């Protein structure tokens, strides 16, 4: 079976390495152009070994078209005579003309329990919405984005402290395992999978920088989840408002909800620091309290929130607001 793999970033790497380890006939890698890869690393993707580096180490041809659906991209794919596309976080949507090139079509390794969280950022939106579990779906590729028949799934719980980066790395391993299982089944004969229930479909749109902006009207659990979801990019941020002084932009890197503690202060208000608590406490929605543990002020290094407070001298009425 001649396989063309398409992927960009750390989520794709275990699937690629698994195919190579199991002696599958990978005839080419399609990955984003180097410029686009750099942009992705600055945004939603973590830096890994690099799909291109893996391919070059194994003497596998690398193609990096800006538009895979162009006449040039289509011609290259046809010349490769693939039996199967294996796609994992590639970063480009394949046209119907491209999808019919391989004799067996294409499979996609998607980091959610489809039909929930169709789109470019399933891991981040899963965490932001306080889901308790997630997983990886292997689907048959169709012109509908993430809408093909489900060939396999694996389910896993989400740890209360997992960031999007942590979870994506873990899901990438699970995805590689079940993708290989699906390919082995396809080698033995046709498989059809189960259609998705469209009524359950939800979206996971690509993240933008402004998605990191913290809404203090949410409760502490929701804000904590939002902060984890925005790691490693775009990172959750807020403005510290002080009387008669310019606001300070702060990235909040780590925080947890204060269990059972409540406050009547308006959301965003910084509570009076306690010498016994090595954190910054902030009022959130529904009378809840968020324990802020680690921050990074604009232009400064990462630091414990308590250290930040000591250096800034808290005053009654200081608050955090949307930027």
Indicate residue ranges for each PLM-predicted region:
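One-carbon transfer enzymes
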Residues: 1-232, 246, 297, 306-309, ...
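An anion-binding loop in the catalytic cleft
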Residues: 217-323
């Amino acid at each position: 079976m001649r396989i063309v793999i398409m992927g960009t970033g750390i989520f794709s790497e275990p699937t690629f390495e698994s195919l190579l380890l199991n002696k599958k006939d990978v005839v080419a890698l399609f990955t984003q152009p180097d410029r686009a890869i750099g942009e992705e690393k600055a945004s939603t993707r973590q830096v890994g070994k690099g799909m291109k580096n893996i391919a070059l180490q194994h003497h596998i041809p690398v193609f990096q078209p800006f538009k895979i659906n162009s006449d040039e991209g289509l011609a290259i794919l046809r010349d490769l005579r693939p039996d199967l596309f294996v796609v994992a976080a590639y970063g480009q949507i394949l046209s119907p003309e491209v999808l019919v090139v391989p004799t067996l079509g294409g499979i996609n390794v998607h980091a959610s329990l489809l039909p929930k969280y169709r789109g470019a950022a399933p891991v981040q939106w899963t965490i932001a919405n306080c889901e308790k579990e997630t997983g990886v779906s292997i689907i048959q590729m169709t012109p509908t984005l993430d809408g093909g028949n489900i060939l396999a799934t694996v389910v896993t719980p989400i740890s209360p402290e997992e960031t999007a980066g942590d979870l994506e790395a873990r899901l990438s391993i699970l995805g590689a395992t079940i993708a290989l299982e699906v390919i082995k089944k396809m080698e033995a004969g046709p498989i059809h999978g189960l259609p998705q229930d469209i009524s359950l479909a939800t979206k996971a749109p690509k993240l933008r920088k402004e998605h990191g902006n913290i809404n203090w009207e949410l409760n502490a659990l929701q804000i904590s989840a939002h902060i984890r979801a925005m790691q490693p990019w775009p990172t959750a941020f807020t403005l510290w408002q002080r009387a008669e002084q310019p606001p300070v932009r702060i990235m909040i890197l780590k925080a947890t909800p204060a269990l059972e503690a409540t406050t009547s202060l308006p959301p965003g208000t910084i509570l009076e620091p306690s010498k016994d608590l090595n954190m910054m406490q902030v009022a959130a929605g529904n009378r809840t309290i968020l324990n802020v543990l680690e921050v990074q002020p604009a232009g400064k290094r990462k630091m414990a929130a308590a250290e930040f407070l000591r250096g800034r001298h808290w005053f009654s009425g200081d608050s955090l607001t949307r930027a």
